[in-house]
Amino acid sequence: MDNKLGLEIIEVVEQAAIAAARWMGKGDNKTADQVAVEAMREKLNQIPMRGRIVIGEGTRDEAPMLYIGEEVGICTRPDAEQFCRVEELVEIDIAVDPCEGTNLVAKGQNGSMAVLAISEKGGLLHAPDIYMQKLAAPPQAKGKVHLDYPPEKNLQIIAESLDREVSDLTVVVMDRKRHVDLIRQIREAGARVKLITDGDISAALSAGFNGTGIHALMGIGAAPEGVISAAALRCLGAHFQGRLIYDPEVVQAGTYLPPVEETRRQLKEQGIEDPDKVWECEELASGKEVLFAATGITDGDLMRGVRFFGGGARTETLVISSQSRTVRFVDTIHMKDGQQPRSLQLR
């Protein structure tokens, strides 16, 4: 992929975050999501690339913007060969979550981000819109912990990898009825639990960095977000595993899920022969080149949220590349057209 693309996708997540942040604390999660989607789509279509949404806002019939299978980018036009360079015509798979944690934005709570991951065609698993059991852990524990291990064993491994006690660890778990037993096991092992209502991509990311105070993510969340998390943690060299969960009795989400056998059949039709397989992050995000970007909408462990001032806004963005093996934190001041801010604060 073109190195220039890494700079251009920064603007994609920045604009989505700014749009959503205008609705922070207003109690309207649907509008926050809608404006983020619209801003992200508009920016994607200004980039000289040939992109295809593989994880997005639903199917074509369910979502007018950024639906699965939608083509984005200038080079998707029929006459693209006339003005796009050869490298810009290479097909790219894109996974997006324009407003991860819409409820967090609506309530003015921490942990919401605008997120995007890209790879060459076939480089990201086309995860179905079901659930996934997830395990994220620091790079020091990569390949040592496992989804099939009980929480107590994984916590002991993580503690030893980080040269600390289990009681020093904090594990993020989504606050769901299905996690009652998991939470009990973590606490009985001696670790602390941080419950979140939404936003497990942010939590998985935090587990991949030292100094966030988060040492693992455990539990069941959405499968598409699992692929995006895997893309980020693969670039970081951290640990991520996922297993698709499709049994309504396990999920306990209160939303409709098809009968188990029907889902198993659909997964096989999509090429997933073993629906109970434990996926490594290198399988979920298998591309030779993987790029991840996220801009904070509200404050989080890694990035501050969007801050507005007279004449503009300020954003913090995280960009991780498997190709260049870089992690960049980008602090950007956005000035409104025709307006000059009275002052620019250094921090």
UniProtKB/Swiss-Prot annotation:
Substrate binds at E100, G101, T102, Y131, R176, K177, R178, D198, G199, D200. It catalyses: beta-D-fructose 1,6-bisphosphate + H2O = beta-D-fructose 6-phosphate + phosphate; D-sedoheptulose 1,7-bisphosphate + H2O = D-sedoheptulose 7-phosphate + phosphate. It is an enzyme of class 3 (hydrolase). One of its GO terms (cellular component) is cytosol. Its cofactor is Mn(2+). Mn(2+) 1 binds at D33, E57. Mn(2+) 2 binds at D97, E100, E225. It comes from the Bacteria. Pfam families: FBPase_glpX. Its EC number is 3.1.3.11, 3.1.3.37. One of its GO terms (molecular function) is fructose 1,6-bisphosphate 1-phosphatase activity. Belongs to the FBPase class 2 family. NCBIfam families: glpX. This is D-fructose 1,6-bisphosphatase class 2/sedoheptulose 1,7-bisphosphatase. It comes from Synechococcus sp. (strain JA-3-3Ab).
